[in-house]
Amino acid sequence: KLGLTSEYFAELEYSKPDILSAMERMVPRIPLDAARWEGEMFEIANTFSDAGVTSKFHEGAADIMSLANKTPIARETRETVDETRSLNDVLDMYVNAIKK
C-alpha cells in the first residue's frame, strides 16, 4: 500500500534471509487460524491488563488477526489452501481487506 514492499524485501533478503523465508512460509497461512487467534489475542490482552501490563501489543495483534480473517484465504482450510501463492500475492489480499 505504501510502495515499500520490494525495498523492504530486498533489505530482508540481504540482512535477514531466514526471517524473509519464514515470512514466505507463515504469512500466507495466518488467515487459516485468524478467527480463533483474534479471540485469543483479546484474552491475552485482558490478562496483561489485569496484571497491570500494557495490553496494546495483543490488542494490535487481534486487529491484525481480524484483518487476516477478511482475506479470501480465511475461507480456505489447511487441506485446500493454495500453496502456490507468493508473499506478494498474500500481501495484496491484506491490502484489499483494509479497503473493505
Model-identified regions with their sequence ranges:
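Short, basic/aromatic-enriched C-terminal tail that caps enzymatic domains
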Residues: 80-100
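Helical "substrate-binding/catalytic lid" subdomain
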Residues: 1-83
